[in-house]
Every structure is written in C-alpha cells, then in structure tokens.
Regions:
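Non-catalytic alpha-helical coupling and interface elements of nucleotide-dependent molecular machines
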Residues: 105-108, 303-307
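Generic structural signal for individual residues within well-ordered alpha-helical segments
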Residues: 78, 100-101, 116-119, 171, ...
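ABC transporter nucleotide-binding domains
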Residues: 4-9, 14-190, 195-209, 213-215
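Alpha-helix N-cap/helix-start and coil->helix boundary motif
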Residues: 13, 97, 121, 195, ...
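Short, Lys/Arg-enriched, disordered terminal segments
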Residues: 1-5, 304-308
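ABC transporter nucleotide-binding domain
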Residues: 175-264
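Short coil/turn motifs at beta-sheet boundaries
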Residues: 2, 95, 138, 223-225, ...
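Short, charged/small-residue-rich alpha-helical element at the C-terminal edge
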Residues: 228-301, 308
Length: 308
C-alpha cells in the first residue's frame, strides 16, 4: 500500500449473511484534499465509514490510515480523527457549550478555547441558553460537526454532513469544510448522495453503488470525461492516438477502449482528422460531437438510476 495516502483500503468487504454491503472496496484518500464518496442511499457509504473508524469489523480486506493498519493500532490512530457518523448522543437538557464541555473532558482536550473555536467555525453561539432539545435539525447537525472538529484532528470523516440543512446552511457548511482543508491543512473524507454538492466541494470523487467502487478520479478528470467532445469509433485507437500526436500535436484526448476515442479539443477540424486517419489505414465508422453533463455521466456509470 502507498504511504502517500492518508486513507487506503484494500479489497475492503462487509458481508451480512449472503448480502455484501461493501464489496472489495479500494479507495485512496490523498493528504490535504477533500475526497467525496458519492452514492445513492443504501450504496454502502455509511458502512464503509464505520469500517474506517473501527465501528464495524470488516468481513475481509484491510484499512490503512497514515500507512498503518487500523487493526491493532486503533488507540494510536483514532484520536487523530474527527468523525460524524449518524447522530451523536447529545444531552437534550444541556446547551451546546455544556454538551461540548462534557465531550472535551472525556477526550482530554487541553485547549481551553477549543469549544468556542469549534462553535465559531460552525456558526453557533458560545454563550447561549438555548437547550439542545430546542435546536432545529440544522443546528443539531452544526453541533455534531463542531464536536467532530473540537479536538483539532488531522483527518475528518463526515457522513452526509449537510443533511437537514437549508440552502444557506449548506453553503456555510461547504465554506467551512473548504476552509478546514485549504487554510488548516485537514484531510477530509465526506459522503453524500447529492451530486451537485460533492461537485462543488470535493477535489477527488469515488462513486460507490451496491457496495462497489465504480469510479475514483479527481473532479477535474471526471469533468473532462463529461465535457463536450468529439467521439471517434474506429479500427485502432492506439494508432489513432499516435496520428493525433504526430500530425496535429494534440494530446487532449482519451482512449475509451480499442475502438473508441474521445477528442476534447473542439477547435480541431474533424474532416482533416478523419482524412488523416483514413490515409494511415484506419477504418473510421463514426465521428460525431457529444455533450454529456456530469449528471448524465453519473447516470451512465451507475446503470441509469442516477444520483440526486
């Protein structure tokens, strides 16, 4: 396994009876980046995150964090991680500050300003008499995130952190998650079923469906795959690539398989390219312009059902 990854899994699997909730999952979370685990509800996101945190034991496979196996190193690794998995058990008759003070004591958080800093980050008041039981769903979600970051962890694992938030709240959460990564150097793994939010936030994306990882690439690479392009169907894509590089000094293309190639530079003359292919012995059966949205791409990858 590559020690350049903060999180790396190898064939991670969780099986309940005959049903695999997660199947042979291999994800790679890079240092100082936001990794978005994207999939519809029931795709296996929460189960994956629970295995990464030692809350659920894998049926098989391995989890490595900072290059070390999680199994046997939980006491060393887990204190360096902040997490939001489902809903924390806050006391309903205490304020946000009182709740966090209890958790700070249990965790031995030494920084006296940690509670206020965490509440400031998520936009909750430090001196507030409102009880947790009086909080809206969005405020409860903010407090859960404050708890996750209070001990200044190096790595954050957040399961659906924008659940229950209104559009303004979602934008604010997006902003401070981005700040945690860009300004404070945190590595963040975030899950969501909302494509539009992941595409606005993540640097790298893993698409999970029915427990299997379908794609894992940077957002820029995925956007290129779904952008406007010219698709060529021909007899030999490797030879076509050499012709594009030699005759047109062009490298902005991607080979899909032996017979399909995508050209991403829309300014090149298609007629001249086809002529060059034919003159060099290639059979060209199709050449046409395609435009696929990021949503269309995800629908295609997940078998047509799509993601919100």
């Amino acid at each position: 396994m590559d020690t350049n990854y903060i999180i790396e899994t190898k064939n991670l699997t969780k099986q309940y009876g005959s049903q695999k909730s997660v199947a042979d999952l291999n994800i790679h979370v890079k240092r100082g980046r936001i990794y978005g685990l994207l999939g519809r509800n029931g795709a296996g996101k929460t189960t994956t995150m629970k295995m990464l945190l030692g809350l659920t034991k894998p049926t098989s496979g391995e989890v490595k964090i900072w290059g070390k196996s999680l199994q046997g190193n939980e006491k060393k690794l887990l204190p360096r991680i902040g997490s939001l998995i489902e809903s924390p058990g806050f006391y309903p008759n205490l304020t946000a500050t009182e709740n966090l003070r209890i958790f700070a004591t249990l965790r031995g958080v030494p920084n006296s300003h940690a509670i206020k800093d965490a509440l400031d980050l998520v936009g909750l008041p430090y001196k507030d008499k409102k009880l947790f039981s009086q909080y809206s769903l969005g405020m409860k979600q903010r407090l859960a995130i404050a708890l996750a970051v209070m001990h200044d962890p190096e790595l954050l694992i957040l399961d659906e952190p924008i659940n229950g938030l209104d559009p303004i709240g979602i934008a604010e959460v997006r902003s401070f998650i981005r700040e945690l990564c860009d300004a404070r150097g945190k590595t963040i793994l975030i899950s969501s079923h909302i494509l539009s939010e992941i595409s606005l936030l993540a640097d790298d994306i893993g698409i999970i469906d029915h427990g299997a990882l379908l794609e894992e690439e940077s957002l820029a690479e995925l956007e290129q795959k779904s952008s406007k392009h010219i698709r060529f169907t021909l007899s030999n894509t490797a030879q076509a690539a050499r012709i594009l590089e030699r005759n047109f000094h062009e490298t902005h293309f991607s080979i899909q398989d032996d017979h399909n190639l995508r050209l991403h530079n829309m300014e090149l003359p298609v007629g001249k390219i086809v002529t060059a292919f034919v003159e060099n012995g290639l059979e060209v059966s199709e050449a046409h312009t395609c435009e696929e949205s990021l949503e269309d791409y995800f629908k295609r990858v997940t078998g047509g059902e799509g993601i919100a």
